[in-house]
């Protein structure tokens, strides 16, 4: 389903933990990393597509996450010319994305990259909040920057509400 401007409707998913870190996933058989994302099927809402992609790509269901926010607007990126499939009609020149910020409420053990017969990812890790903006492939960087900027206050408020470790001897440093 490509729109009149040549963009494919898509959802993007940022999953965070209580420490304000975000899940960063390695594309299957590649050295590139990104957030989970995927197309919206005909007749499917953005939220329905998000839950479907969440399960297909990282094995999580509704009970494992809580929706914290979604982007106000659709965000677009163009594909580099070398990635455009010119032989398909209509030609897709990029993606228009609705992004969701989710908090993982179950444990890390629930994450499973192998739920699909054709997995998108083969590994993942928690990274600092702004890390993906610097590391994602260049043609997605502007969208990632906008997404992370829009979601930042929500994620930072999670961190503020997370109990801090007690000041025990394990955390003390001798001053001299």
Curated annotation (Swiss-Prot):
Domain of life: Bacteria
Chain span(s) of sequence motif Nudix box: 38-59
Signal peptide positions (record): none
Cofactor section: a divalent metal cation
The enzyme's E.C. designation: 3.6.1.-
Alphabetic keyword roster: Hydrolase
Domain Nudix hydrolase positions: 6-149
GO molecular function, one term: mRNA 5'-diphosphatase activity
Gene3D superfamilies xrefs: Nucleoside Triphosphate Pyrophosphohydrolase
GO cellular component, one term: cytoplasm
One Gene Ontology term from the biological process aspect of the record: mRNA catabolic process
Family in the record: Belongs to the Nudix hydrolase family. RppH subfamily.
PANTHER family in the record: M7GPPPN-MRNA HYDROLASE
Protein purpose: Accelerates the degradation of transcripts by removing pyrophosphate from the 5'-end of triphosphorylated RNA, leading to a more labile monophosphorylated state that can stimulate subsequent ribonuclease cleavage.
Protein name, UniProt field: RNA pyrophosphohydrolase
Organism listed in the record: Shigella boydii serotype 18 (strain CDC 3083-94 / BS512)
Organism lineage: Bacteria, Pseudomonadati, Pseudomonadota, Gammaproteobacteria, Enterobacterales
């Amino acid at each position: 389903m490509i729109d009149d401007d040549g963009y494919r409707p898509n959802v993007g998913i940022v999953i965070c933990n209580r420490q304000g870190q975000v899940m960063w996933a390695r594309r299957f058989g590649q050295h590139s990393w990104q957030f989970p994302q995927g197309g919206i099927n005909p007749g499917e809402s953005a939220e329905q597509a998000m839950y479907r992609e969440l399960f297909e790509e990282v094995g999580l269901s509704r009970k494992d996450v809580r929706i914290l926010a979604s982007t106000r607007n659709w965000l677009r990126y163009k594909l580099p010319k070398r990635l455009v499939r010119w032989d398909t009609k209509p030609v897709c020149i990029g993606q228009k994305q609705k992004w969701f910020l989710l908090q993982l409420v179950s444990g890390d053990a629930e994450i499973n990259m192998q739920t699909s017969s054709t997995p998108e990812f083969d590994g993942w890790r928690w990274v600092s909040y702004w890390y993906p903006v610097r590391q994602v492939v260049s043609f997605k960087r502007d969208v990632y920057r906008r997404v992370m900027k829009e979601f930042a206050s929500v994620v930072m408020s999670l961190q503020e509400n997370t109990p801090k470790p007690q000041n025990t001897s394990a955390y003390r440093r001798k001053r001299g």
